[in-house]
UniProtKB/Swiss-Prot annotation:
Gene for this chain: ileS
Full protein name: Isoleucine--tRNA ligase
Motif 'HIGH' region positions after renumbering to this chain: 59-69
'KMSKS' region (motif): residue ranges: 618-622
InterPro entries per UniProt: aa-tRNA-synth_I_CS (IPR001412), aa-tRNA-synth_Ia (IPR002300), Anticodon_Ile_BEm (IPR033708), Ile-tRNA-ligase (IPR002301), Ile-tRNA-ligase_type1 (IPR023585), Ile-tRNA_ligase (IPR050081), M/V/L/I-tRNA-synth_anticd-bd (IPR013155), Rossmann-like_a/b/a_fold (IPR014729)
Length: 943
């Protein structure tokens, strides 16, 4: 080459870095956002817009954040940011759940239980300090994820104002008639020393003993007569029960049957030499008798369970205790014997059926529930023959009771079985039902269950199956046990009558007065309060309740304790948490909301799945497959983590591994490189001076704006329905196919070789400007740091941050009367693929080195040929080939052929043209390049 024409080319130039270097750049951006008060600016910029309130479910203030936290917070952040771009004011107030047992345990490990080194007030203060420290640690990591919010003013359930508002919320619940007190069986953790709510229970496999125990009939002849049978002399009758909790037998007060179940009177094993007939459900008789070593089923009569109602049995080892036969809906013929031993102190159904029959009034509290809060039998528990039970822990009592019953004739069978059993979610230890005095929110007393089920129907659930799931849980759940016998929490600030146990008739008024004091001095005010200050002369007749509220009540009333205080409306637009929260926060919020306002506290409810490894296994330290968000941010950056979360199907389990992270890093590079190429080609472009109107653009440029418009409509709709995976996929496809494989490739010629200010070049830059303006907004909710960086490099005048803008309004579809319609472009792109297929073997066999060395002939039917012939001169730019000829042929198909060109190559544009050398001043250039350098420049209409 005799002359160097490089200086005449307009090659891409940008300072936007090729490498993201996110672990270094992101912290600097965070510092700037913090320094400039970014969240406050964002809210101020959005003032006056319609509100969209995503109410934050509070994480527990204990321990470092994990991957599940990151998923939750980033999903929320994507939604909040997309709402700002959609023209909303979307305040985000993060919160923390600060009371409860895990924090108590942490303080107990250091200082011992209350009363050892610290009194209750000092203990609560240490809990408060610990929770505050944990919040600071978690807040730092949440901010590092790129999550925007009012981090300087979060809501915390330990704040005096919140604690006061929680007591005010309780007053509304009381006022509406939902609070009740009673001795009921509740889930009890012996390690916690407290009742547990449904949401605090998880199920795990446990090996339990199974026993079949015979309850002898007091009047065997009467039982036989109910079956239409005559009992021979010397034959006994018994009703066997099957249970996995032998420890509950000392509390057994009845045996329940199914009213409509069919029972048979069958010959059973002898009782120490005496013949014995047994009452067993017909469907279970053969199986039960086989357990007892009886092969043949010899039936002496049939009867419905209802025929045996109120007949009396003997307790298997407390002979003086008469055991009535009751009827219960909970009895089935699925397993066991069809007869259920009934201990009202240790089971919900047992309690209900016993209450129905008035059984509870016949026995004292120690007989109904002989087990204390540590899981030990009370001193008053009678012995089993010569075997003492008092002081024995129930888990040890199982084997002791079984051994003591051997040889007595009542133990028909004993074995072991593994089954799913409720455990404490904190201690991972088995729990038990214990009847204790507790405070409940009744599901029936003021129609809470029916109202809640109705409210569920008015909520939009994502995914849709969430509606049936939570409805099933609410429909079948027991009353909500809201009292806890612990120290660190919000007190149930009620005064109850010393004799009747009834709450003071002015309870709601008194609760509000207590709340006013708590707002000034915290919950300690309740414990130091002299009752006479509020009750005057009545104080001697009343005592203060020292139980605290369930932590699920704490978080469940945040809609009442937080939103009105912050000037935000109820119900919130959206609650978003993990799928376990149908039985947790979603449900506690629903029940409290309906109890207070007869409405759900949210309009929409979205759930996400749990994180697992690439094999679908739960992440854990023991498996060594855990991936911490902090490590991802240190090595790859928060935007890579955010991209993975957005691209995953969060409605199911979300798989993560190093390989998956690598794939997301590759996808990120594709997006970043696209942005960099756009910026590089916008070098020297000023939209105020150079922007070409849409109707004046080269048609290929107009087409890419059309494609961007269609994509934006798709993206905006997907953000609105929270389908982030579709957005990521659509973006990557647009970058790879529409831009990477086509538009950016085709327009290089115009951008590089045309005169700097040529309309064809400015047209391409204008299209790229429109695409870049839209692109930065599309990625902003997901790739927050990268979008901010890209925003700072865009040409033209802009607001300070991309989130101060809204979805880009500079895009538009191709008009229906365009010289080339969208359908025309679709056909041309199919033709372009045909050309590529024809050229591929020519490249392979060495006939050509590049597509520019091939001349193309397109043969089509007359109508198609006539449509495309005006484009023929520019089709070579679309195909990035040598000259293109379009001919009419008598065929319905389109045929493409190619041959190597014999024309000289222009050293500047690399096209092979007959005009190369036609200008003696530039013997190595084609006439087009000469015109672009020195003349008026070429004109383009199509491509």
């Amino acid at each position: 080459m005799t002359q160097d024409y490089k200086a005449t080319l307009h090659l891409p130039a940008t300072e936007f870095p090729m490498r993201g270097d996110l672990p270094k750049r992101e912290p600097a951006m965070l510092e700037r956002w913090e320094r400039e008060g970014f969240y406050a600016q964002l809210r101020a910029n959005a003032a006056g817009r319609p509100l969209f309130v995503l109410h934050d479910g509070p994480p527990y203030a204990n321990g470092q954040i994990h991957l599940g936290h990151a998923v939750n917070k980033i999903l929320k952040d994507i939604i909040v940011k997309s709402k700002y771009l959609a023209g909303f004011d979307a305040p985000y107030i993060p919160g923390w759940d600060c009371h409860g047992l895990p924090i108590e345990i942490a303080i107990e490990k250091k200082y011992g239980k209350v009363g050892v080194k610290l009194d209750a007030a000092q203990f609560r203060q240490k809990c408060r300090e610990y929770a505050t420290e944990q919040i600071d640690l978690q807040r730092r990591d949440f901010k590092r994820l790129g999550v925007i919010g009012d981090w300087d003013n979060p809501y915390k359930t330990l704040d005096f104002r919140f604690e006061a508002n929680e007591i005010r919320a309780l007053a509304k619940v009381v006022d509406n008639g939902h609070l009740t007190r009673g001795v009921k069986p509740v889930h009890w953790c012996f390690d916690c020393g407290s009742a547990l709510a449904e949401a605090e229970i998880e199920y795990a496999d446990k090996v339990s003993p199974t026993v079949d125990i015979a309850y002898p009939a007091r009047d065997p002849g009467a039982v036989a007569a109910a079956f239409g049978a005559r009992l021979p002399a010397g034959v006994g009758v018994a009703v066997p029960i099957w249970t996995t909790t032998p420890w509950t037998l000392p509390a057994s007060l009845a045996v329940s049957l199914g009213a409509e179940l069919d029972y048979v009177l069958v010959e059973g094993p002898a009782d120490r030499g005496q013949p014995r007939w047994l009452v067993i459900a017909e469907a279970l008789a053969a199986k039960a008798l086989a357990r007892y070593g009886v092969d043949a089923v010899v039936v002496h009569g049939h009867a419905k369970g209802a025929a045996l109602e109120q007949m009396l049995l003997n307790h298997p080892f407390y002979a003086e205790r008469e055991i009535p036969l009751l009827l219960g809906d909970h009895v089935s013929a699925e397993d066991g014997t069809g007869a259920v031993h009934t201990a009202p102190g240790h089971g919900q159904e047992d309690y209900q059926v016993s209450r129905h029959y008035g059984l509870l009034e016949r026995y004292g509290a120690a007989q109904i529930n002989p087990v204390d809060g540590r899981g030990v039998y009370l001193p008053s528990t009678p012995p089993l023959g010569d075997t003492a039970l008092a002081g024995l822990h129930i888990w040890k009592a199982n084997d002791v009771i079984i051994d003591a019953l051997r040889g007595t004739g009542v133990l028909l069978a004993a074995s072991k079985m593994e089954h799913s059993y409720p455990h404490c979610w904190r201690h991972k230890t088995p729990i038990a039902f214990r009847a204790t005095p507790q405070w409940f929110i009744s599901m029936e007393q003021a129609n809470l269950r029916a109202d809640a089920l109705k409210a569920i129907e008015n909520v939009h659930w994502y995914p849709s199956w969430g509606q049936a799931r939570i409805a099933g849980m609410v429909d079948g759940r027991p009353d909500w046990t809201i009292s806890r016998q612990r120290t660190w929490g919000v007190p149930i600030a009620l005064f109850v009558h010393r004799e009747t146990g009834e709450p003071h008739p002015r309870s709601t008024e008194l609760l509000r007065q207590v709340a006013d004091r708590v707002e000034q001095g915290g919950v300690d005010v309740w414990y130091t309060l002299d009752a006479s200050e509020l009750l005057g002369s009545e104080a001697a007749d009343y005592e203060k309740i020292t139980d605290i509220l369930d932590v699920w009540f704490d978080s469940g009333v945040t809609h009442e304790a937080v939103l009105p205080d912050r000037g935000l409306p109820k119900p919130a637009d959206l609650y978003l948490e993990g799928s376990d929260q149908h039985r947790g926060w979603f449900q506690s919020s629903l029940l409290s909301g309906v109890a207070m306002d007869k409405a759900a506290p949210y309009k929409q409810c979205l759930t996400h799945g749990f994180t697992v490894d690439e094999h679908g296994r739960k992440m854990s330290k023991s498996l060594g497959n855990g991936i911490e968000p902090q490590d991802i941010m240190k090595t790859l950056g928060a935007d890579i983590l955010r991209l993975w979360i957005a691209s995953a199907d969060y409605s199911n389990e979300m798989s993560l591994s190093q390989e998956i992270l690598k794939r997301n890093a590759d996808a990120y590079r594709r997006l970043r490189n696209t942005a960099r190429f756009l910026l590089g080609n916008l070098h020297g472009f000023d939209p105020l001076r150079h922007l070409v109107a849409l109707d004046q653009m080269v048609l290929l440029d107009r087409w890419i704006v059309h494609r961007a418009h269609a994509l934006q409509e798709k993206i905006v709709a997907a953000y609105a329905r929270y389908d982030f995976a579709e957005i990521v996929q659509a973006l990557l496809n647009f970058c790879s196919v529409d831009l990477g494989s086509l538009y950016l490739d085709v327009t290089k010629d115009r951008l590089y070789t045309m005169a700097e200010d040529a309309r064809g070049r400015r047209s391409a830059q204008s299209a790229m400007y429109h695409v870049a303006e839209a692109f930065v907004r599309w990625i902003a909710p997901v790739l927050s740091f990268t979008a901010e960086e890209l925003w700072s490099y865009l040409p033209g005048q802009h607001v300070d941050n991309v989130l101060f803008a809204t979805w880009y309004d500079g895009l538009a579809p191709l008009p229906a009367d365009a010289a080339l319609t969208s359908a025309d472009f679709d056909k041309l792109l199919v033709l372009r693929e045909q050309v590529a297929k024809v050229l591929e073997p020519m490249r392979a066999n060495g006939a050509i080195g590049a597509a520019l060395e091939a001349e193309i002939t397109v043969a089509a039917d007359a109508q198609t040929a006539a449509r495309w012939q005006p484009l023929a001169e520019e089709l070579r730019f679309l195909f990035i080939s040598g000259d293109v000829t379009v001919t009419a042929a008598s065929t319905d198909d389109i045929f493409v052929s190619a041959q190597p060109t014999t024309k000289a190559k222009c050293v500047r544009c690399w096209h092979h043209q007959a005009s190369v050398g036609s200008d003696p001043r530039h013997p190595e250039l084609c006439s087009r390049c000469v015109s672009n350098i020195e003349g008026p420049g070429e004109q383009r209409r199509w491509f």
